[in-house]
Amino acid sequence: MNISNQLSLEQEFELVLYKQKIEPLNLEQSRNLLAETLRTMLLKDNIIKYVIKNSHFSQ
């Protein structure tokens, strides 16, 4: 496994907390949280792309 595919200890802890948060949710609440999480991940991707595009390291 590549090191970039591994989670840090902090990320592992965050994952455990997230699992605890979703455990009591019903199906509708779980679906809503999943949609919110996906939206957040897509926004994060956009921010990363923007930073890379506008950095001094882009070619």
From Swiss-Prot:
Main location: plastid
UniProt keyword terms in alphabetical order: Chloroplast, Plastid
InterPro entries to which the protein is assigned, alphabetical: NblA, NblA_sf
Domain of life, source organism: Eukaryota
Cellular component aspect of the GO annotation: chloroplast
Pfam families reported for this sequence: NblA (PF04485)
Keyword Transit peptide: no
Family statement: Belongs to the ycf18/nblA family.
Protein name (Swiss-Prot/TrEMBL): Uncharacterized protein ycf18
Organism phylogeny: Eukaryota, Rhodophyta, Bangiophyceae, Bangiales, Bangiaceae
Gene: ycf18
